[in-house]
Amino acid sequence: MIRRNFNFAMAGLATMVLAAPNSPVALAHENGVVKTRSSYSMLETIDRITKDVEAKGIKLFDVIDQAKLAKDAGVDIKPSTLIVFGNPPLGTQFLSARPDSGLDWPVRLLVFEDDKGQVWTAYTDFKWIAKRHGIKNRGPQFMKASEVIASITSSVQTR
């Protein structure tokens, strides 16, 4: 019975993994990076995300066009833009637990184009951030941050 359940679970996992490249579902990797495929162009993805951040009352700190920075430095890269935002009353709770967690706050969401022209979003998983910094007493806050980033990235997942 246990073996059958294990095989069933593994088959389900394999199906999810195989379907993932064509799905807008967020993909978390062991390095803590969560990637989500966007259904929109680069510019529209950035526009939708920044508007959603502001509509949620979250502070938009900066939008950094990394491809422009690279071009200005004489380097050619695919489109890549870093969006920096956060909610200081929430984010500073992580810093109060571990000051070095400031390396991961405010939130940074990368919008980039891959070699096939597909637009993606990427951010650091909040559970991974908690583990990285050894923060064990901010579970509800990490849960809230995870819910917010999932909501923001969902704004670019469907047409």
Describe each region flagged by the PLM:
Residues R108-G134:
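Beta-strand/loop substructures that line and gate deep hydrophobic ligand-binding cavities in soluble
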Residues V25-G57:
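Terminal, regulation- and interaction-focused segments at domain boundaries
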Residues T50, E54-I58, D62-V107, V111:
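Compact, glycine-rich, soluble single-domain proteins
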Residues N31-R37, D76, P99, K116:
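Mature soluble domains of exported/periplasmic/lumenal proteins and thiol-rich metal-chelating peptides
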Residues M16-V25:
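C-terminal segment of classical bacterial N-terminal signal peptides
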